[in-house]
Amino acid sequence: MEPGFWHSKWDTQQIGFHQNEVNPLLIKYWPRLNLNNLVNTSVFVPLCGKTLDICFLAELGHEVIGCELNETAVEHFFTENDLSYSTSRVGELQKFATEQVSIYQGDLFSLSHEALSSQEHRTIGAFYDRAALIAWPEEMRQDYVQKLAALIPPKSIGLLVTLDYPQEALKGPPFAVSNDWIMANMAEFFEVEILSCEDVLSENPRFIKKEVPWLTESVYRLIRRG
């Protein structure tokens, strides 16, 4: 999955992956992470786009740190939410920042643990992945998991949302990620608890049009081992 693919999507505004409201699963399950003692910590949101989920997390009192490849997406997040921001260079990335939200724009694999743990940020205690893991084809997905594990401290608690369907029925993204894949490839780094798995085919016309026979959406609670 080359960067040009995602830049093209944003350039042409083919951003069906973007949701114009806060994700209902975030609203429902974020309290299940039991983060009452982590109000003063940061939440890391990889491949964040311009998601309104960031605003929801910030309104809960969290500092939110995102990472997004496309500069247009980051600019749109701040302008569409009427947020003034400053910019600075951090290594190979550009950092957009306002009081409670920072987004590192550039390649996730160029983001360092040191940048996230600098004195400018609160300690990361949580993370949220709704559209990152499922954005990677299987041959790149494990590299992403290892990078995520390297970026966040031990004991960090995360909410992960995935989709699963017969991959041969539809060319991703979003790519199919099964529960078996999660357990085989993420359990080394994270304690994994599945919170829900629901049939969502009727809510996704694209999948129906392509005659995908079934589609499930799962929610996981993860805890970074260590």
From Swiss-Prot:
Q: Which GO terms describe its biological process?
A: methylation; response to metal ion
Q: What GO molecular function terms would the record report?
A: thiopurine S-methyltransferase activity
**According to the UniProt entry, what is the EC number of this protein?**
2.1.1.67
Q: Which InterPro entries match?
A: SAM-dependent_MTases_sf, Thiopur_S-MeTfrase_Se/Te_detox, Thiopurine_S-MeTrfase, TPMT
Please provide the record's keywords in A-Z order. Cytoplasm, Methyltransferase, S-adenosyl-L-methionine, Transferase
Positions binding S-adenosyl-L-methionine in this chain are: 10, 47, 68, 130
Write out the GO cellular component annotations.
cytoplasm
Entry's localization field: Cytoplasm
For this protein, what reaction is catalysed? S-adenosyl-L-methionine + a thiopurine = S-adenosyl-L-homocysteine + a thiopurine S-methylether
Record has Cytoplasm as a keyword = yes
Gene3D superfamilies documented for this protein: Vaccinia Virus protein VP39
Q: Enumerate the NCBIfam families for this protein.
A: PRK13255.1 (NF009732), TMPT_Se_Te (TIGR03840)
Quote the PANTHER family the UniProt record gives: THIOPURINE S-METHYLTRANSFERASE (PTHR10259:SF11)
- Similarity comment text for this entry: Belongs to the class I-like SAM-binding methyltransferase superfamily. TPMT family.
What is the name listed in the Swiss-Prot or TrEMBL entry for this protein?
Thiopurine S-methyltransferase
Lineage start:
Bacteria, Pseudomonadati, Pseudomonadota, Gammaproteobacteria, Alteromonadales
